[in-house]
Amino acid sequence: MRAIRALVDAYTTDRRLLSKATVTLYEAVQEFWVAVDEQDGTVAGCGALHVMWEDLAEIRTVAVDPSRRGQKIGHRIVSVLLDQARELGVRRVFCLTFETRFFGSFGFTEIDGAPVPHSVYEQLLRSYDEGVAEFLDLERVKPNTLGNTRMLLHL
């Protein structure tokens, strides 16, 4: 977990990733996929897939060791997460990002609002997960998400 924490922190100072409490990372540790350097055993990158509803998931907290950028680690992480989504039967994957070209290379497109029926929206309002609140674009989290782009991929 310390390695994931360090990767996240490397991108939150310039607000390229939303800051997360360490307890939140621990609560979601089973959602993470971690890329490990085979030579030295260090964590090179991470990313998580959070299922929100029967047909909807979010890719979140994708981070690569800054010294290893450009090595396609992020691409491999997102590819694995999309494969996991397919295996789970998820048909749509959401992300909230500044990296629109990166996610666009996978087929993500920009969206407005929360692409769920009102009945699902009402159920999602009951979630305590901050990422779900960000997906719903709730007023209380808007200061955290300023400048981010909402994107969706249909699998």
Specify the residue positions occupied by each region the protein language model found.
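Short amphipathic alpha-helix that is part of the acyltransferase structural core
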Residues: 1-20, 36-37, 42, 147-155
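Surface-exposed charge patches
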Residues: 6, 83, 101
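A generic local structural motif
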Residues: 18-21, 78-81, 137-138
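A conserved beta-strand-loop-helix scaffold within acyl/acetyltransferase catalytic domains
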Residues: 15-38, 44-64
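Conserved acetyl-CoA-binding loop-helix of GNAT-fold acetyltransferases
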Residues: 64, 70-85, 94-95
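Terminal substrate-recognition subdomain of acyl/acetyltransferases
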Residues: 86-88, 92-155
